[in-house]
Structure formats: structure tokens, C-alpha cells
Regions:
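Glycine-rich, acidic/polar active-site loops that bind/position phosphate-bearing ligands
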Residues: 1-175
Length: 175
């Protein structure tokens, strides 16, 4: 936790908008949420990773962003990406969100190809994932490729989508 707290402060000091940190399912697994728009979001993610590696060095530990750093019956490491546009946030409808999800399903294979190496080890259909070769979406469905948050539905379909397919080692410029 000390590393996570120091990392959070280092990112904030660097002008990177982190919106939270939390411990995850696997032992020693931590998550942080990075907020940004477009290319700035990708830039900030790379800098935040760099800061995390440097801080971990000072503690004599290593950071591992492999999608499944240890095989077994537990969750892997993903880089879930929330996204929205102005229409989704202010004039959304169930039809709009369904159409967007269907369009993402049409290019599922292309997305998977860009979402990080060894992602097949994580996207097995178990441990809050959809199988790498299948596409699905649903409200509050952590086992779907695309999760529609309850927040979005409760706010008259105004909100965002969460792409749960990218792995922790993904290149944010490709995603």
C-alpha cells in the first residue's frame, strides 16, 4: 500500500489525473485509475508507469504488468478503458449504447490484436472476463467484453462504456 500511496502522490505532483487506487483480487495486485482525454491519456499512462517502476525500484520490488503474471485460479491484470463522447454523456439512449457495442463487436478481432500480448492467458471466460474469441456486452456485467455501468443506465443512458478487454501491458496509443 505504501508504494501505491507514493505512486498516487507522484502522479498528482506530475499533473497526471489519477482518480483512485485500490487493491485487487490477486495477492500484491493493485490498480489505479488514470483519467485523461485522447493522446494526453496515453501520455499520462506511460509516464505513470515509468513513475511506478522507479518507485518500486526504491523499495526493491518489481512491477509486473503481464496479463496473467502467475497461472492459477485467480484474476489476471487488465487495463480496463472507460470511454465516452459528448453525445453519450448528455444525450444517450439505450439504442445508442447498444449500437456502439454492436459496432465494437464487429471489429472485435482487430481490437484484441491491439490489446496487449499474452492476453489469451487472461481472457479465458473465467475470473470476470469474456473468452478472447467471443464478444459480449451487458449492464453491470464484469464477465462481458464491454460493460455498461449501472451509473449510465441510472442516468437515463447518459454516461460511458468500459472496455474490459485490454490487458495491463497494452500500448495506450493503440487502444
Amino acid at each position: 500500500r505504501e508504494i501505491a500511496d507514493i505512486h498516487l502522490q507522484a502522479c498528482l505532483d506530475a499533473g497526471i489525473k489519477l482518480t483512485g487506487t485500490n487493491a485487487e483480487v490477486a495477492l500484491g495486485q493493485w490498480e489505479y485509475q488514470c483519467f485523461g482525454n485522447g493522446i494526453k491519456a496515453a501520455d499520462d499512462l506511460w509516464v505513470s508507469r515509468y513513475l511506478l517502476y522507479k518507485i518500486a525500484e526504491e523499495f526493491g520490488v518489481c512491477v509486473n504488468i503481464h496479463p496473467k503474471p502467475k497461472t492459477g485460479d485467480w484474476n489476471g491484470s487488465g487495463m480496463h478503458c472507460n470511454f465516452s463522447n459528448e453525445e453519450m454523456r448528455t444525450n444517450g439512449t439505450e439504442e445508442l449504447f447498444s449500437t456502439m457495442c454492436e459496432k465494437l463487436g464487429e471489429v472485435h478481432a482487430e481490437g484484441i490484436a491491439a490489446y496487449g500480448s499474452d492476453n489469451d492467458m487472461r481472457l479465458t471466460g473465467l475470473h470476470e472476463t469474456q473468452s478472447i474469441d467471443q464478444f459480449s456486452y451487458g449492464v453491470s456485467d464484469r464477465g462481458a467484453s464491454i460493460r455498461i455501468p449501472v451509473y449510465t443506465v441510472e442516468h437515463n443512458w447518459n454516461g460511458y462504456l468500459e472496455d474490459r478487454r485490454p490487458s495491463a501491458n497494452m500500448d495506450p496509443y493503440l487502444v
